From Swiss-Prot:
InterPro entries: Ribosomal_uS11, Ribosomal_uS11_bac-type, Ribosomal_uS11_CS, Ribosomal_uS11_sf. The gene is rpsK. Located on the platform of the 30S subunit, it bridges several disparate RNA helices of the 16S rRNA. Forms part of the Shine-Dalgarno cleft in the 70S ribosome. One of its GO terms (biological process) is translation. This is Small ribosomal subunit protein uS11. PANTHER family: 40S RIBOSOMAL PROTEIN S14/30S RIBOSOMAL PROTEIN S11 (PTHR11759). GO terms for molecular function: rRNA binding; structural constituent of ribosome. Part of the 30S ribosomal subunit. Interacts with proteins S7 and S18. Binds to IF-3. Belongs to the universal ribosomal protein uS11 family. NCBIfam families: PRK05309.1 (NF003698), uS11_bact (TIGR03632). It holds the Pfam family Ribosomal_S11.
Length: 130
């Protein structure tokens, strides 16, 4: 066997960010939390489904809380202290995700609802008859 030359690997330098933004996308089926820097570059993210919840348990407030804690702990490696929170969607995990980020130790400076609202755009889906 010929010896394969080893590639030199450099340790990735983690940038230090003091202020960040938390984007919470709470749909009826799942909750996605992304923590970014001021420019919008993702530092960490977590989902209810990726946190071990499957099926209808993904859409619970507790699953959103666990996902927010995972994203928050991962973003602390970058030195984030203050968060501006943007919440999108009507899901059940909206409020519990914000509370979980607060419990991790972040100072939440601002909470903004950025749920897209149509100005009479597309026709909505028909109502379910069960």
């Amino acid at each position: 066997m010929a010896k394969v030359p080893s590639r030199s690997t450099r340790k990735r330098v983690r940038k230090q960010v003091a202020d960040g933004m938390a984007h919470i996308h709470a749909s009826f089926n799942n909750t996605i939390i992304t923590i970014t820097d001021r420019q919008g570059n993702a530092l960490s993210w977590a989902t209810s489904g990726g946190s071990g919840f499957r099926g209808s348990r993904k859409s619970t407030p507790f699953a959103a809380q666990v996902a927010a804690e995972r994203a928050g702990v991962a973003a602390q490696d970058y030195g984030v202290k203050n968060l501006e929170v943007f919440v999108k969607g009507p899901g059940p995990g909206r409020e519990s995700a914000i509370r979980a980020l607060n419990a991790v130790g972040y100072k939440i400076t601002n909470i903004t609802d950025v749920t897209p609202i149509p100005h009479n755009g597309c026709r909505p889906p028909k109502k379910r008859r069960v």
